[in-house]
Amino acid sequence: MRTRIEGTLSIAAVAVFLSIGSTAVSQTKKPTTLAELAAYTGADREQLLLAGARAEGKVVWYTSLAGASFKEPMKAFEAKYPGVKVEVYRSQSSDLGKRIMTENKAKRFYMDALETTLPLQKLLHEDKMMTPFTSPHLSKYPDIAKRKADKGLYFWAVDRESYSGLAINETSITAASVKNYEDLLRPEFKGKLGFAISETGPRAIGAMITAKGEEFVRKLKSQEVSLHAVSGRAVADLVASGELGASPTVFRSHASEIAASGAPVTWIPMDLVPTNAGAVSLPISAPHPHAAVLLIDFMLSPEVQAIFEKGQQGSPAKDYGFKRWYPEEGMNSEQYDKASTQWEKLLREIGRN
């Protein structure tokens, strides 16, 4: 009997030992696939990613950022992580989308990481072309700047923002007297208010509808609003020259640049501030998975956020004292396209060319 019990206990002890050993092995197993690396939260995350990235040698980055906005982060990444070269394919988001779709359909995966605006990010998410990820920096980002997936992961995270608001020429209109959208109906704005009819204009209309309702927007027609088929920067120049007294379609960065040159231009955030956001994401498959995740972490780091701020872009991790409004929030890509079309239609109805 004693021998039988001892034998049973020995078998149980071996089973427990094997179970513990198996658990220990599973806990110490290092991630290797893109999905595993993207979800890894170990203390050695950066070290592990860097070692793998150096073995891979490069990262292929698709982005719609322009000029110094992509060159400076690229240089900083290569300086911080020598041995990992950044190869960039840069284009407008619409062209990026076509390229990514074509490559995905052909099962030819060249892209490691993506940085582009939210409409394209939404489209790729809807087509199930993303690998969810986490990052040690994301705890500092508000929920609105992160698209949740399962298990504490995210499909994308906003890494930079641009803000449009009301720019006024102070020789025409006094800045101190302007606080919100309602003030645009005051007599001193009549004949002086202009909108860009590029993307910035319809998004401004969307913000006004969200904050004040469509009836308020229709009241602006009595203000003899002028419409301009030019860029947001060109509209800012019209305000600076005095051709326009004010425009709610001017980016903060453009107004700051013009004001720094001595022009009497002041930028005022309104009830809602339409926010153009760029976000980072991972594709469904990446040829250089370690480098891909390393680049995503880097783009969300305080180091790159400081680079963007130096270039007059905003960080989603900071509070600038106004209420951001992401026009795409709460909509899928089809719904956003429909809403954008409606905003543009209303803008043309209240304006004069």
Annotate the PLM regions.
Residues 10-21:
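Bacterial N-terminal signal peptides
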Residues 42-54, 60, 64-85, 309-313:
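Short, polar/charged alpha-helical segment
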Residues 120-123, 245-264:
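A ligand-binding cleft/hinge motif common to bilobed small-molecule-binding domains
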Residues 143, 161-163, 189-196, 200, 219-221, 226-229, 299-321, ...:
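Periplasmic-binding protein-like
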Residues 165-172, 208-209, 276-291, 307:
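A bilobed periplasmic-binding-protein/Venus flytrap-type ligand-binding module shared by bacterial periplasmic
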Residues 304, 319-353:
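Extracellular/periplasmic bilobal clamshell ligand-binding domains
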